Amino acid sequence: MTRTRTALIGAGFISASHIEGLKAAAPEVEIAAIVDRNRALAEGKAKQFAIPGVYGDIEEMIAAGGIDVAHVLAPPDAHAAVAGRLLAAGIDVFLEKPMATSVADCEALIASAAGLGRVLGVNQNFVFHPTYRAARRILIDQRRLGPIRSLHVTFSVPLRQLGARQFGHWMFQKPVNILLEQAVHPLSQIVDLLGPPAAITARAAAPLQLAPGLTFQDRWTADLACGDTPVQLYLAFGQRFHAWRFTAICDDGLLVCDLSAGRVMVQGRAQWPEFLDNLVVGAGMAGHIAGQSIGGAAGYLTGLLKLRPKSDGFFVSMRDSIKAFYAGLPSRTAPLDGCFGAALVQICETMAGAVPAPAASRRPAAVEPAALNPDLVVFGGTGFIGAHLISRLVAAGRRVRVVSRAADSLLPPFDSPLVEIMRGNVAKREDVERALAGATVAVNLAHGGGGADWEEIKRTMVGSALMVAECAKAAGIARLVHVGSIAGLYLGDPAEVVTGSTPPDPEAESRALYARGKAEADRALFAFAAGSGLGLVILRPGLVVGAGTAALHGGLGFFNNEQHVIGWNEGTNALPFVLVEDVADAIILALDAPNVEGKAYNLVGDVRPTAREFVGLIAQATRRPIAFHPQYVQWLHAAELFKWGIKRATGKSVDPPSKRDLISRGLRAQFDCGDAKRDLGWRPVADRDLFIARAVDVHRAPFERAA
């Protein structure tokens, strides 16, 4: 039997889910190739999952031949072009949601697939979510509650990109995009249950004002008429509490399908008198909910221990969606075909039509390096610290070149005529060399990337920092300001006073990967600068807070959810907070300060609340019941050892947890930043009320609503 050879078009985060789903659902399928314009990303995935073919574009893959099926995981606005080319090349296509960004594109793909005799399927995997499937069996297959008379759907979910202010993401570019990106999940279940709606009435709340020229439609309501069944839909994006559920009211009971909790609740009737019926039905419902909750926890743990196949809802939905697609290939059909995908896009287009088109926002275009002749280059300048830095540089009238991988979707301050946006990747030497051409000073805010093991961290975090320094020296850069982190220091001794001359942790190899990477990057940079004569200054900010980042910093503890902060210790020691504005000021000062080459400076402000105090301030400002839970390092270490033991039992090769790292995360050491104040002329905010206004009060309402 000839094996089906499959290619993945796109090596982003969802590709791993497709690979795992393919291996579980269709082990007879050979994952033969992976394609991505970022070839290094594709090579990394190929190495991780033993995929033999790696290509930089689909034309290269098509020319090589031998591919039967392609999973299109490219950005949504590329779906139509990529899928159309693959179909024309005689390749069956499995499209990630949304099918395309317009009904016209969907119809063109449907016609192309039909004319060429190819299979076109859409991955609306939440139609295969086990909780939804359980509800569907009760409502449709078994008809246990009679006809569905009304359906009420709530989809109120967090949105990571909104909290991280990643406004360059495709979903923020126009109102329909968030619907295509997120709303298709609940819509797919509505259409699967009741069919496409014949009529739609939609409304949207006043949008959030994310930035000058950019609004975001975060709340929607819609009435859909699906046959004789009315559907009420509520959508909210960027919410604190994850609530995804639907209630089906039927002739003989109601069903609540809670996708967030993985539970289905059925309320019916028994044969008893009403007072007794309520008791019997209520007790049965309680027992059923408890049983589902226990079963879900048991399934997760046994799956984690590999005592049974992996069974979390998302994985199962991906596995079963992929399985259904491949099961249909012999008959040349797809369970969720182009018509299904097009119906969802049609609903999104209709809903978006209820919202006035936003005014065109001013966006900078990527330009060639010689356009402004700036003497200052900033790598990683579009992040949290970078945005504040660029704002201050622009306010001072300084011309600056910002290197960004998303050069076509930036907002103020990056639209200033003093800012040159250059598309580039700090991991690519040729991009770094091109960016530094003609400059005299540079700032490196880019962290370089992460990794699952030390070799990858050394390549991304340490290697990229060193490569920027090497390119800076070769380009004749007079001063390179590298922005690292206090994480590379050992900060667990309450008796130690830490200054800029305190060296990186001498036992960094015993620390967690991030801390070790920061420590080794500092060491490598100092060694290179000493040997080459590069004018290097290293700045190590503390816990950076302020407008534009999450309210709760990871230096406070870790979070099983954002309402509960599990402290790194008892939470009674002063923490090394610093305002983002003060960090930006220090970077600018370090560009020109005399006699600072070859030195490091820690950036910690003069207002230093404890973890308990800071969490309490945030809770008060946001009017939310956020709690700090003090811990002892011994307990934390024991818990980490337990988790490490589980990973080892499942065959994972992982290093044991470092108690030294946990102690250091408590940040008990004392910081003396007198050297930064003396040498740089740095003056961080010392007024407690002003600190609270900038670090805490800004989170009362991160975004205003547009008029």
Question: What do the PLM-derived regions correspond to, one by one?
Answer:
Residues A11, P374-A396:
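N-terminal Rossmann NAD(P)H-binding glycine-rich loop of SDR-like oxidoreductase domains
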Residues G84, V103-A104, V441-A442, A452-H482:
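NAD(P)-cofactor binding segment of oxidoreductase domains
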Residues V127-R203, L208-P212, L525, G557-N561:
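Predominantly a Rossmann-like dinucleotide-binding segment in NAD(P)-dependent oxidoreductases
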Residues Q346-D375, F671-D679, R683-A707:
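Amphipathic terminal alpha-helices
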Residues H18, G53-I110:
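Beta-loop-alpha module in the N-terminal Rossmann-like domain of NAD(P)-dependent dehydrogenases
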Residues D415-G463:
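NAD(P)H-binding glycine-rich loop region in Rossmannoid oxidoreductase-like domains
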Residues L187-P273, S311, S317-R332, E349-T350, ...:
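Contiguous beta-strand/loop segments that form the cofactor/metal-binding neighborhood of enzyme cores
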Residues N123, G463-Y514:
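Conserved Rossmann-fold NAD(P)-dependent oxidoreductase catalytic core, especially the SDR/UDP-sugar
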